[in-house]
Design a protein with these regions (language model features):
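N-terminal Lys/Arg-rich, disordered targeting/topogenic segments
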Residues: 1-16
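An acidic helix/loop motif centered on a single conserved Asp/Glu
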Residues: 60-82
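Conserved hydrophobic/aromatic pocket- or pore-lining residues that grip, position, or stack substrates
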Residues: 48, 70, 234
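Short domain-boundary/entry signatures in modular proteins, especially
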Residues: 37-43
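Short glycine-rich His-centered loop
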Residues: 43-63
Length: 243
C-alpha cells in the first residue's frame, strides 16, 4: 500500500517540477530579452543621407559631381563607426540606389533615428563660399540643436567654418514647400531668395558648413586631406553628443 502511495506522489511531483523548471526558464529568458532591449535602446541610431539624386546632381568642380562627393563623405563617416558598438549607423540609400529627396525624407521619418545627417555639398552664390549642408530633423528638438552645436564646434576646432540655420517651411501645392533659411536669431543674409524643395511632414534643422573661403574655391574638395578633415570633424562631433 505504501509503495502505491509513493508512486502516486511521485506522479504528482514530476509535473510540479516541470512547471517550476518552465517558470524559471521563462523568467531567465524574459530577463535576457529585457537586457537585450535595454542594450539596443541605449545605442545611438544615426541615419546618414547622401544628398542630391542622380537626375540633377550638379557639380562641385569641373569634374567632381555633388552626388558623388556627398556619397563619399557619407561612406567616410560611416566607416568611422564600423567598430563602434555604441552606434547603429543606417543609410537612406547607398551608392547603388538612387532616391529623390521626398523618398529619402519619408524613409527618415519612418526609421525615426536619434539623429539624421544629410550631406549636401554646394557652392553658395550669395555667400561666395563652398560648403556642406547637414540636415538634422526634427527642428525644435533640444537634442538636435545640441547635436548641431557640437558638430559645428568640432568643425570650427578643425578650422572649418560652421553656422547653424533653421529651415522655415511655407506650405505649397503638390507636395512642394518653399523654404527660407533662417539663423537661430535672425534672417538669412539679405539677398538670399527662398528656395523650393520637395518635403514631407517633418520639421528640419540644417547646419551649414562653410570652409571660410571667400573666393568660393570648390577645387579644394578634390584634395583628399581636405575631405578627410571634414569627415573626421563630423565623426568627432557625433561622438561628442554622448558626452
Amino acid at each position: 500500500m505504501s509503495r502505491t502511495r509513493r508512486k502516486k506522489r511521485k506522479g504528482r511531483v514530476r509535473p510540479l517540477r516541470l512547471l517550476l523548471v518552465v517558470f524559471v526558464l521563462t523568467g531567465l529568458l524574459a530577463g535576457a530579452l529585457w537586457l537585450l532591449y535595454q542594450t539596443l535602446d541605449e545605442k545611438t541610431v544615426i541615419e546618414l543621407d547622401a544628398g542630391h539624386d542622380q537626375t540633377q546632381p550638379g557639380y562641385v568642380s569641373d569634374t567632381l559631381r555633388e552626388a558623388d562627393l556627398d556619397m563619399e563623405i557619407v561612406l567616410g563617416v560611416r566607416d568611422k563607426f564600423a567598430e563602434n558598438s555604441d552606434y547603429v549607423i543606417q543609410l537612406t540609400h547607398d551608392e547603388l540606389t538612387d532616391m529623390n529627396m521626398t523618398s529619402r525624407l519619408e524613409k527618415i521619418d519612418k526609421d525615426n533615428p536619434d539623429l539624421t545627417i544629410s550631406i549636401h555639398t554646394y557652392e553658395d552664390p550669395y555667400l561666395r563660399k563652398t560648403g556642406t549642408l547637414i540636415v538634422v530633423p526634427p527642428s525644435g528638438s533640444r537634442k538636435s540643436i545640441s547635436a548641431a552645436e557640437k558638430i559645428c564646434a568640432s568643425l570650427q576646432e578643425a578650422g572649418r567654418g560652421c553656422e547653424v540655420v533653421r529651415m522655415a517651411y511655407e506650405a505649397g501645392r503638390e507636395g512642394r514647400s518653399t523654404v527660407r533659411y533662417l539663423t537661430l536669431e535672425e534672417d538669412y543674409p539679405s539677398g538670399a531668395e527662398s528656395r523650393e524643395i520637395f518635403s514631407v511632414d517633418s520639421a528640419v534643422m540644417e547646419i551649414q558648413l562653410l570652409n571660410m573661403n571667400d573666393t568660393g574655391d570648390a577645387e579644394q574638395w578634390t584634395d583628399p586631406a581636405f575631405k578627410a578633415s571634414v569627415i573626421d570633424a563630423i565623426a568627432k562631433g557625433i561622438l561628442s553628443i554622448a558626452e
